[in-house]
A protein has these predicted regions:
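Hydrophobic transmembrane alpha-helices that form the pore/transport pathway of multi-pass ion
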Residues: 60-128, 134, 138-139, 147, ...
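Short, membrane-interfacial amphipathic segments enriched in basic
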Residues: 13-19, 52-57, 334-353, 382-386
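Hydrophobic transmembrane alpha-helices
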Residues: 46-49, 84-85, 126-131, 372, ...
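Membrane-interfacial helical/loop segments at transmembrane boundaries in membrane proteins
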Residues: 3-26, 267-293, 389-398, 403, ...
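Membrane-interface helix-loop-helix modules in multi-pass membrane proteins
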Residues: 1-52, 69, 83, 87-88
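Hydrophobic alpha-helical transmembrane segments in multi-pass membrane proteins
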Residues: 39, 43, 73-74, 82, ...
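Long, contiguous bundles of hydrophobic transmembrane helices that form the permeation core
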Residues: 155-364, 468-520
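Membrane-interfacial loop-to-helix junctions in multi-pass transporters
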Residues: 26-39, 66-78, 110-116, 197-204, ...
Length: 520
């Protein structure tokens, strides 16, 4: 039995296995857990804060305002909205359920079949994890396994993600043209201009995240924490804002910023440091330009402090722009029932509920991801202690016969099969450990290898018979699950074509020459 001999290993004792899995960095406490603690939790928390702020609802309404009146408008709105939401949630099923509850009924009402409506939603929802800049949890594993800066991963993933979503847009357009499906009437949609004026600030956290990662080139962890602080400060400012308080809000922010910069320029210490005993330095400690840059970096803290003072001074004032997630409003209402207080109608109470609900939601989501990542750490640990990695590599190369195309097909099939019913992070870890060292031997760029695995693994969410995202969409659409999954698989075929394209043409990933030659 040649195959059996290929997987033969030396005899191992249980104490050796336990030692390797639990007390070394090659097992459960290896790279995946390290990444989940340092990076993944931070960005899951950021996604929770942004979603609870009401950004999720705003992005969905924005998608309908932009595309709703076009041919096949509801389906096109689903493509745009699910891309935004999937980028934040990092879960195909959660994204399908969240956005599908709004988009699928509208698609059915406009003339799409229930199966097609569910297929569109599940397909684009599973693709949300490939959309920069957040890209779900797997992006941070790519950073750690490849040693590629996060900004380079974001840049490389942009064109393939655009290609996938553009392909989905084209397919729903052709289906609308075939069925004669038009768009929604303008009276059913929010006015784009007024909608932007009421919620443009939801774009600020994403813009700041890109600035911190791509331009300022901060570490991933610091960029994440600073963006979370900025999101909390933004919601605090929105809660504190109304016509009566706006002069105090903006005046206080300007005064705080000026005081911060002046203190740094004159003493080298911030006002808080001086307040708690930092000694002033004679003469200017930093240049004016450096002081302004430092004050700008600390602007979210100033905004949060001024806004909280106004909220505490007038907790029941109006907040015309505050439109938090329904989960936050419900949580505040439950507090009212239990305590007999009127927190739901208080802007200060709603802000407090927002912070607590976001922390609760982020912690619950992170727990699920971290547990899955810990479990996935068993696989590389076992492969390392048994030495199966080399045997698997030799077997895969032998089966492929040295053909790169056949090797990629085998890798894609493995990613789809392993990914069925599994979180994306677990699938990615297993496939990268098994196949990651093999593909670069054929001259494939390391980043292309890891993005290839991510793309093909996401296909599992819409591939029969498991197709968890398609099942979730079928439940909302009240359609046949298998027919919905079949349609979703066909719609997602460009999720297979795109990774093959950037493997053979690394220029799609905007890789520099030295990056194309990198190996694991």
């Amino acid at each position: 039995f040649p195959v059996a001999r290929t997987f033969a290993t030396s005899e191992l004792r249980w104490d050796q296995i336990v030692q390797n899995l639990w007390y070394t960095v090659e097992g459960i406490l290896g790279v995946p857990v390290d990444v989940s603690v340092r990076f993944i939790y931070i960005f899951i928390l950021f996604g929770a804060f942004l979603e609870m702020s009401g950004a999720g609802k705003w992005f969905i309404d924005l998608a309908y305002s932009i595309t709703g009146t076009r041919k096949g408008g509801p389906a096109k709105a689903s493509v745009v909205a699910s891309g935004f939401m999937g980028m934040l949630s990092g879960s195909s099923v959660a994204n399908t359920v969240t956005t599908g509850a709004l988009t699928i009924p509208l698609m059915k009402r406009s003339g799409y079949s229930p199966e097609f409506a569910g297929a569109v939603e599940s397909s684009v929802s599973s693709g949300g994890q490939i959309l920069p800049p957040v890209m779900g949890a797997a992006a941070f594993l790519i950073v750690e396994y490849t040693g590629t800066p996060f900004r380079d991963v974001v840049i490389a993933a942009t064109l393939p993600a655009v290609a996938f979503f553009f392909g989905m847009w084209v397919m729903v357009h052709f289906e609308a043209a075939k069925r004669g499906i038009g768009g929604l009437s303008r009276s059913e949609l929010l006015d784009l201009g007024s909608h932007m004026r009421r919620g443009w600030f939801y774009l600020v956290p994403l813009g700041l995240l890109l600035y911190y990662l791509v331009i300022a080139r901060l570490s991933v962890g610091r960029a994440g924490w600073l963006t979370i602080v900025a999101t909390v400060a933004l919601v605090a400012a929105v809660a504190a804002y109304n016509e009566r308080t706006s002069p105090f809000l903006f005046g206080g922010i300007a005064a705080g910023y000026a005081l911060f910069a002046a203190s740094l320029a004159a003493t080298g210490a911030t006002p808080v440091e001086l307040l708690f005993g930092a000694e002033a330095v004679g003469g200017p400690a930093v240049t004016v330009g450096a002081a302004l840059r430092e004050a700008t970096a600390s602007l979210p803290t100033v905004v949060a402090a001024v806004s909280l003072v106004l909220l505490l001074a007038d907790p029941r004032g109006e907040a015309p722009l505050l439109d938090l997630d329904d989960g936050v409003v419900d949580a505040a209402a439950r507090v009212d029932e239990r305590t007999g207080r009127d927190a739901a109608s208080s802007r200060a109470g709603q802000f407090g509920a927002f912070v607590l609900k976001a922390m609760d939601s982020g912690a619950k989501t992170a727990t699920i991801v971290v547990v899955a990542v810990v479990a996935a750490g068993v696989v590389p640990g076992i492969i390392g202690i048994t030495g199966l990695g080399g045997s698997l590599r030799a077997l895969i190369i032998s089966v492929s016969g040295g053909s790169l195309v056949l090797l990629l097909i085998l890798a894609g099939l493995a990613a789809v099969i392993v990914g069925m019913g599994m979180p994306t992070t677990v699938m990615y870890i297993i496939i990268v450990v098994l196949l990651g060292p093999v593909l670069p031997e054929f001259g494939i760029a390391i980043l292309a290898v890891h993005l290839f695995v991510l793309y093909l693994g996401l296909m599992a969410d819409v591939t029969p018979p498991v197709m968890v995202a398609a099942y979730a969409a079928a439940g909302i659409a009240k359609s046949d699950p298998f027919a919905t999954g079949k349609q979703a698989f066909l719609l997602s075929l460009n999720k297979i074509l795109v990774p093959f394209a950037f493997v053979f043409s690394p220029g799609i990933l905007l890789l520099r020459t030295r990056d194309r030659k990198s190996v694991v």
